């Protein structure tokens, strides 16, 4: 069975248009407004990315770093991110939602506990910016077992050989 993310890309391809994927950081503005923001952008977006803030977002640009800083100042915690997702998915079950963030928070919570929270809140996919291939293989397998897409990143400097391996191992 295809994932919601794959079905969404299929739908966009059939309509001969690119998918609109939006991004916001949970808790930037306020915890309560995060849900309102997701609901508003979901009316136009095909897939939503929701960042879980980290205190040292070194792989992100200035805009996301600033958003993460504001979210943390607003007191956002990982448990709050899952509550936001769960509330959003209550009325938007078919809209794919991808969490994006850093492995340190997953490590602190424990991979299995983190993935359990992802599944129970309705997360469809994960982007973990600081967990590269092949170090991510075990975590990727755990995601696959739980039907959570693990989205890996490529850069313009990724070699063709490495790209083939990453694509082969993606789901």
Language-model regions: role of each:
Residues 1-12, 54-66, 73-86, 106-112, ...:
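Active-site-adjacent beta->alpha loops and helix N-cap segments on the catalytic face
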Residues 8-28, 61-67, 89-100:
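N-terminal small/glycine-rich loop or linker at the start of catalytic domains
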